[in-house]
Curated annotation (Swiss-Prot):
Glycosylation sites: 297
UniProt propeptide residues: 18-111
Compartment(s): Lysosome
Record's comment on post-translational modification: Glycosylated; contains GlcNAc-alpha-1-P-Ser residues.
Molecular functions (GO terms): cysteine-type endopeptidase activity
Designated gene of the protein: cprE
Main location per the UniProt record: other
Catalytic residue list: 136, 272, 311
One Gene Ontology cellular component annotation held by this UniProt entry: extracellular space
Leader peptide range in chain numbering: 1-17
Organism from which the protein derives: Dictyostelium discoideum
Keywords on record: Disulfide bond, Glycoprotein, Hydrolase, Lysosome, Phosphoprotein, Protease, Signal, Thiol protease, Zymogen
Domain of life according to the entry: Eukaryota
The protein's name in its UniProt record: Cysteine proteinase 5
Length: 344
């Protein structure tokens, strides 16, 4: 009954918005979307999810009609509200306000380039999926650790997020955590198990780390100057970098392609851990741009520099699991506010 009551509230709240399509258009779009994403609902749930989908469809249409460089679409999160999305998929809670502007500028390499992409160098594992577990911090941690191990040992090994969720006790498993705490666990534990030996379950469990299954070790980690995108660029030239961002907005939830810029984003209140694997400039069409619903053309005043960011929501979200986030645009969404990378 609680689930039904909750869905009834959702049904009422989303049904009041002004509709932009005919009922037939909504129904056909929802039917196609359910087939594409292999979704099914109980009879009690269908009506609420349908109305949420319609509201998200309207939001996508309104956003894309403005010709933003950010293109939204009806991705795998199109049947949930923004509140549900935030409560289920965002698991890093961090206030960076005390750090920004208080640290000495850190430079990690003297070399620089117009672009960088660790994927092309073989340092990045395929996109993973955290499921309905707020363990984003663990995926960000394994991603940067996999990159550091690759550079040191010459082999790309997929590492265990479940190991971190179960055993990194400074963190809170599926209820959230910080990448720096996870680095400290790996350092103090003298290793992290491989993904194959300690597979992901998307739930909290008992720690079952086995040293004989360790896939990588770390000696330390480095932090990027809080708020400095030039320091972050220097770090990304050294290794894939774990970053915390503000991903709370509906525009991030429904991102499909283009360069992501959200004027309402916070650079201090961060709620999602992801992995910066490179940077570049341009429209983003050469970085795996998917078929969005609008052109996503850059306006003359818009920056076309971006960070290449690996997410942990599967390949149905974004550009095959990636997002291009605005670069050198006032630290949008806090991309450089809390960034760090490990050292083998």
């Amino acid at each position: 009954m609680k689930v039904l009551s909750f869905l009834c509230v959702l049904l009422v709240s989303v049904a009041t918005a002004k509709q932009q399509f005919s009922e037939l258009q909504y129904r056909n779009a929802f039917t196609d979307w359910m087939i594409t994403h292999q979704k099914s609902y109980t009879s009690e749930e269908f009506g609420a999810r349908y109305n949420i989908f319609k509201a998200n469809m309207d939001y996508v249409q309104q956003w894309n009609s403005k010709g933003s460089e950010t293109v939204l679409g009806l991705n795998n999160f199109a049947d949930i509200t923004n509140e549900e999305y935030r409560n289920t998929y965002l698991g890093t809670k961090f206030d960076a306000s005390s750090l920004i502007g208080t640290q000495e500028e850190k430079v990690f390499t003297t070399s620089s380039a117009a672009s960088k992409d660790w994927r092309s160098e073989g340092a990045v594992t395929p996109v993973k999926n955290q499921g309905q577990c707020g363990g984003c911090w663990s995926f960000s941690t394994t991603g940067s650790t996999e990159g550091a191990h690759f550079q040191s040992k010459g082999e790309l090994v997929s590492l265990s997020e479940q190991n971190l969720i179960d055993c990194s006790t400074e963190n809170s498993g599926c209820d959230g955590g910080l990448m720096t705490y996870a680095f400290e666990y790996i350092i103090n534990n003298n290793g992290i198990d491989t993904e194959s030996s300690y597979p992901y379950k998307a739930e909290n469990g008992k720690c079952e780390y086995k040293s004989e299954n360790s896939g990588a070790t770390l000696s330390s980690y480095k932090t990027v100057t809080a708020g400095s995108e030039s320091s972050l660029e220097s770090a990304v030239n050294v290794n894939p970098v774990s970053v915390a961002i503000d991903a709370s907005h509906q525009s991030f939830q429904l991102y499909t392609s283009g360069i992501y810029y959200e004027p309402e984003c916070s650079s201090e209140n961060l709620d999602h851990g992801v992995l910066a694997v490179g940077y570049g400039s341009g429209s983003g069409s050469s970085s795996g741009q998917s078929s969005g619903q609008s052109s996503g053309n850059l306006s003359a005043s818009s920056s076309n520099e971006y960070w290449i960011v690996k997410n942990s929501w599967g390949t149905s979200w974004g550009i095959e699991g990636y997002i291009l986030m605005s670069r050198n645009r006032d630290n949008n969404c806090g991309i450089a506010s809390s960034a760090s990378f490990p050292v083998v």
